[in-house]
């Protein structure tokens, strides 16, 4: 399984909901605000907003919070003016890390992100230093334990007809890759067949991975945790290849 989707699944399982929910709702609200500001407040006409609202609902964010965030984005309600910014750098072992942030103070966020990199044996780089190693794609994974009696050939045909670019299967999971434009159509095709999806995001997929082990791997995971935990950081992507068992415990 791709490192990022595996990381996301494990992070979801390990999260202590009561502690994380407030921070998660804040990040989901930011995405809705920026999406509505960028493309208008109607999810039917704004793909990015539609995806943000769906993700918020999947995480049990109250409808009142969602509506309030949309109105802040369209200007109906007063709110912060968030700016989108990306940061790039390297973690221990030469792992490439790319992250998206939304902030009302770029200088503060840059300083704090740099500090997190430095204290975890990484370094924040210049714009473009690792972006070329990633492609923005739709990524859907299916946990085979949750999808018993699945016919993989039929599934491959279904996703190909819906526009999927790639279909990979191993002992534990199925991974489907799409363009960002075809992601929603492929996801809906699977959901219409009631296929349980363990991960479904438009994400950044690395073109190659870096194997890290032992203490170095633990340092990479610690860096990932701290970056993801920062209030202004929305998404963190990396090209590490770390053993599943270490990610489960690390």
Swiss-Prot record:
GO terms for cellular component: cytosol. The keyword Repeat does not apply. One of its GO terms (molecular function) is DNA binding. It is found in: Cytoplasm. GO terms for biological process: regulation of DNA-templated transcription. Keywords: Cytoplasm, DNA-binding, Transcription, Transcription regulation. It holds the Pfam family Transcrip_reg. Belongs to the TACO1 family. NCBIfam families: PRK00110.1, PRK12378.1, YebC/PmpR family DNA-binding transcriptional regulator. This is Probable transcriptional regulatory protein Nther_1800. It comes from Natranaerobius thermophilus (strain ATCC BAA-1301 / DSM 18059 / JW/NM-WN-LF).
